[in-house]
Amino acid sequence: LVQTSIEFVIGSAGCTDPNAGNYVPNAAIDDGSCIDNAQLDFDTEVTNTGSNHTVYIPADVIFPEGVDFNLEEDFLGAFYLSNGYPILGSDMVFDESINDGSFQVVIFGDDTSTPDPDGFYNGQEFIWAFQDSNSGNSLFLSPTYQNPTSSNSYLDDGIFAVESFDILYGLTGCMNSD
């Protein structure tokens, strides 16, 4: 009797749907973890209104499983709702003198001297999102802040620090198309 045992690795598991928000291009096995693409516009020109709220993202921030954040290529941003649509209201800012992988997200407040909203109102909730640079797909995130008294809302001259992000599986809001 002769027995032979062969072991081989097919590849990593992950979301194999290229239209999903958490698509993993090198995944060989679909693990059923696909999340709808939020289809957010990270190319929007963000206006520096002179009012801001800074959110520090440390190098050791924890992203959800399946989100492989690449600091030099991917995008992380805070959106606000304007007429029911999410609008990018932040910029990722890097300090050239600090190379530990940390960065800041500067979130801009509304310029009240203009008629249209062009930033966050005081107390307006942040809608966090991640965009993968390779696929262009995006998904919503929910932050946990280092200070438990920090809210997830805009505060003029506010400073928060994020400890981790989780995937936000749905964004609720007005469903009336009129």
What are these regions (language model features)?
Residues 1-178:
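Primarily marks secretory-pathway-exposed extracellular/lumenal segments that are disulfide-
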